[in-house]
C-alpha cells in the first residue's frame, strides 16, 4: 500500500507521517517513508526555486517511490508528485512563463494514480515555524495551498481532506479508519465478483 500526505509546507505533514508510521509499526506492519525531496534538493527551493530544482524534485520523488517495490510494506510519501508540481507551476507562472510545463504536469498527474490514497492537510491559522528549510511567509504558504487544491480539483485526483486540527492522534485515527473502511468495501466487492 502506498499513501501520500500532501499540502502546503509547514502543515505538519512530516510529523504526521512519523506518527502514522509508528501506528502502523505497532500493528506489526513494515513501513517505508519516502522523505520530502525538497529537503534533499541541491538547488534553491521556496520562493527562490528554479525550474531545475523543481524538475530535480519531481524526478527524484518518482525515482524514490519506484525504488520500493514491496507489496508487504506500507509506503508513506511525504508529499506526492502533484504538490511537488504545484511549486514548479508557481515558479514558472511568475518567473519563467516560456517553460513548457505540459510534460511535467502530465507526469505529475499520471503518477498520482500510483497512490492507494492521498490525504491532504489543511492550512490552519497557525504561524509556520522556521526549520531552516521551508519558508514561513503566510502569503506564500496560502498561495501554495490554493494551487495544490486547484490542481487536485482540476484533474479530479482522488484525495481525502484531513480534519482541521493539529492533533496528530486524531489524524492517525482518521486515516486508519478510512483505510479500514476502504479495505472492508474492497473485500465485499471482491466477494461479489
Where do the language-model regions lie?
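A glycine- and Lys/Arg-enriched "phosphate-lid" helix/loop adjacent to the NTP-binding pocket
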Residues: 92-170, 183-189
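The conserved Walker
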Residues: 9
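Short loop/turn segments at strand-loop or loop-helix junctions that form parts
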Residues: 36-38, 79-81, 120-125
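Conserved nucleotide-sensing/catalytic segment adjacent to the nucleotide-binding pocket
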Residues: 46-91, 96
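Conserved lysine of the Walker
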Residues: 13
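Conserved substrate/cofactor phosphate-moiety recognition/catalytic segment
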Residues: 21-62
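Hydrophobic anchor at the beta1->P-loop junction of P-loop NTPases
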Residues: 5
Amino acid at each position: 500500500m502506498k499513501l501520500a500526505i500532501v499540502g502546503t509546507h509547514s502543515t505538519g505533514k512530516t510529523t504526521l507521517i512519523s506518527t502514522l508510521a509508528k501506528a502502523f509499526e505497532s500493528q506489526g506492519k513494515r513501513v517505508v517513508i519516502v522523505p520530502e525531496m525538497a529537503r534533499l534538493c541541491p538547488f534553491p527551493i521556496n520562493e527562490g526555486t528554479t525550474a531545475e530544482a523543481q524538475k530535480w524534485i519531481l524526478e527524484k520523488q518518482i525515482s524514490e517511490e519506484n525504488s520500493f517495490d514491496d507489496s508487504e510494506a506500507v509506503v508513506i510519501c511525504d508529499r506526492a508528485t502533484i504538490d511537488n508540481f504545484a511549486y514548479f507551476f508557481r515558479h514558472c507562472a511568475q518567473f519563467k512563463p516560456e517553460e513548457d510545463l505540459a510534460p511535467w504536469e502530465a507526469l505529475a498527474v499520471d503518477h498520482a494514480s500510483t497512490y492507494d490514497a492521498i490525504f491532504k492537510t489543511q492550512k490552519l491559522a497557525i504561524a509556520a515555524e522556521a526549520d531552516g528549510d521551508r519558508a514561513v511567509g503566510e502569503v506564500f504558504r496560502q498561495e501554495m495551498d490554493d494551487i495544490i487544491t486547484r490542481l487536485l480539483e482540476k484533474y479530479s485526483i482522488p484525495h481525502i481532506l484531513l480534519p482541521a486540527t493539529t492533533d496528530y492522534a486524531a489524524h492517525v485515527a482518521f486515516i486508519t479508519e478510512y483505510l479500514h473502511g476502504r479495505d472492508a468495501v474492497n473485500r465485499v466487492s471482491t466477494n461479489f465478483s
